[in-house]
């Protein structure tokens, strides 16, 4: 199942710099693990924002929820999810 996910990060301005560095490092490691596993095949930065657009390829809604809630930055994110379906006009490759 494919999902289009927008993640907007809102870290507190008064967050301790060492805490911020740690959480960002853990986020990078976890997201790269999911990318290597093929569950997070596309990741793009939104220009000028601390946000991204991603495509997840997972087996179920529950699996996606588990992966997203496991992100170290999850408590600081606004996340919007759109399930995707194959378009009938897509060129077959």
Task: Briefly describe each language-model feature range.
Residues 1-93:
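Conserved, structured core segments of small domains
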